[in-house]
């Protein structure tokens, strides 16, 4: 039951710095132009070395963030991220030494701009934390009912989740790592989109981790991982509607997926159509997931909430 899930809200200055570097390095629109100016030189030098090493730059930054979120040291996080991005094992130490100082420069520039970040994040996280305490258990209970018809497995919901709060760079963002039972969120003070409250982003990330863990542990059919991930969006939105957090006859699937940086407009339209078609279905969830899988464009692959980083 959802009541067994507790979230520990933790301000995370180190992840904030890494997230800012990631945003600048990947040329993602950034709300803090000053930070963009401060970090562009060191992260560009990091990227240049990554390109020279012929590794997957996007994979490097994603895995680097996951390691920092798990409180791994910068140097070790860098080495592990390089391996995940395809660096030759014999070259990892050399490449790490070449870029870790630049990462350190970016970190120091960020923390100098936000010298009291830990205290600020604690204050910024408070409204969302209070909103989650009010609506979170109800949202997860509603999601569980939709999937399991009032009888979710005992281990469906994670008992403990750590939520790492970071300085907003994109006006609302988040991601998760089911393996470590951790998620991260930009500590925005108000809802970015009133029609899709931020508390629903939290519910979506917690649900995504539950789906990921359960599917990997119980199913050999990993082809259903993608539809499982996509279904998490309307499930959470519909739960929000039950609690009067979402208004209107049509679920704002497209708006939510855009806000959560998950999928594109074509995928969102397909998910919305599938949701409408299966509303009155009595078929088991796996059967309905296969229907969604058949509706998806062939080019879609490897998408999950954990890629929302």
Label every PLM stretch briefly.
Residues 134-144, 199-203, 229-232:
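Well-ordered, non-membrane alpha-helical segments in soluble/globular domains
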Residues 93, 111, 115, 175-178, ...:
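Alpha-solenoid helical-repeat scaffolds
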Residues 277-309:
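Long, compositionally biased intrinsically disordered regions
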Residues 181-217:
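Active-site recognition of the HExxH zinc-binding catalytic motif
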Residues 2-69, 211-283:
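Post-HExxH zinc-binding segment in Zn-dependent metallohydrolases
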Residues 52-140:
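Long, mid-chain structured domain cores
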Residues 112-179, 238, 242-251:
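Auxiliary, metal-adjacent structural segments of Zn-dependent hydrolase domains
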Residues 116, 124-135, 190-194, 220-228:
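Conserved aromatic-histidine-acidic binding/catalytic patches
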